[in-house]
A protein has these predicted regions:
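A structural signal for multi-pass alpha-helical bundles of membrane permease subunits
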Residues: 2-283
Length: 283
């Protein structure tokens, strides 16, 4: 019986988990191998002698060097960081206030308004970038970071509000009521009691907003045109693909280096992210 349980555990747990992990990590492995593979191996026919598709025989960093010296990758990285952090701060500020008001204050149609805010998040971006581009053109913000800093919150604020609403609802109201009884105004109770308790939810909303801003492509492609203003997703794909020529080594190096900040954020705040998501769902 013990042996049967052992095999069932392998068949129904270890094998699926192993397959899932391999499928999840293989793209990153492929990016690493391609970024350090010399050109003579990248374009070698599959039936050639000593052909090794899953590893390289002569690793080199020439593609990383060319990416950093012959392109504006450093500028793209800085632009992406500034835009992502700015959009995240704006979205968190508005989402905190809206989520607190809709979950902790009593007024008519609060639930209906919260549902409406989340529905706006479900609207496809392809339907919004045309009117948004008209607004950006009227305010003369085209081809500038402000075009993205002011448009990203249009889809980040609804989700942050919905996520924080669920987390605020899971916090006992007695904590806030005790502070109010002791004479603290509502804004102090919110700032010094509710927000510290809701820190996992706030961090999870911030991680989501930062990741989505970092990887966003459609708005950055439409609103930014000059190479000096582009973000990493647009800069790498537009400057390293010329006609029908794909610079695969530089492309994979750019994708790999561009994913480091997001991986760094998730690795340090993954516990807060998971607890924030589960807390919001439970609420």
């Amino acid at each position: 019986m013990i042996e049967g349980r052992y095999w069932r555990r392998w068949v129904f747990f270890y094998v699926p988990v192993t397959a899932f992990v391999v499928a999840l990590l293989f793209p990153f492995y492929w990016m690493i191998v391609t970024s350090v593979r010399p050109d003579k191996e990248l374009y070698r026919p599959w039936n050639a002698a000593n052909y090794a598709p899953f590893w390289t025989l002569h690793p080199t960093f020439e593609h990383v060097r060319d990416l950093l010296t012959q392109t504006l990758f450093g500028t793209w990285m800085l632009n992406t960081m500034i835009i992502s952090l700015s959009a995240t701060v704006i979205s968190l500020f508005c989402g905190l206030l809206a989520g607190y008001a809709l979950s902790r204050l009593r007024f008519r149609f609060a639930g209906l308004i919260g549902t409406g805010i989340f529905i706006t998040y479900l609207v496809p971006q392809t339907l919004l970038f045309i009117p948004l581009s008209d607004i950006i053109r009227n305010f003369k913000l085209g081809d500038s970071p402000w075009a993205l800093i002011l448009t990203y919150p249009t889809f980040l604020i609804p989700f942050c509000t919905w996520l924080l609403m669920g987390y605020f609802k899971s916090i006992p109201k007695e904590l806030e009521e005790c502070a109010r009884i002791d004479g603290a105004p509502r804004w102090k109770a919110m700032l010094y009691i509710i927000f510290p308790v809701a820190l996992p939810g706030i961090l999870s909303a911030g991680i989501f907003a930062f990741t989505l801003s970092w990887n966003e492509f459609i708005y950055a492609l439409v609103f930014l045109s000059s190479p000096e203003q582009k973000t990493i997703p647009v800069g790498v794909t537009s400057e390293l693909v010329r006609g029908d020529v794909f610079y695969w080594g530089e492309l994979m190096a750019g994708a790999l280096l561009g994913s480091i900040p997001v991986a760094f954020v998730y690795s340090f705040f993954v516990e807060y992210y998971v607890s924030g998501i589960t807390g919001s769902v439970k609420g």
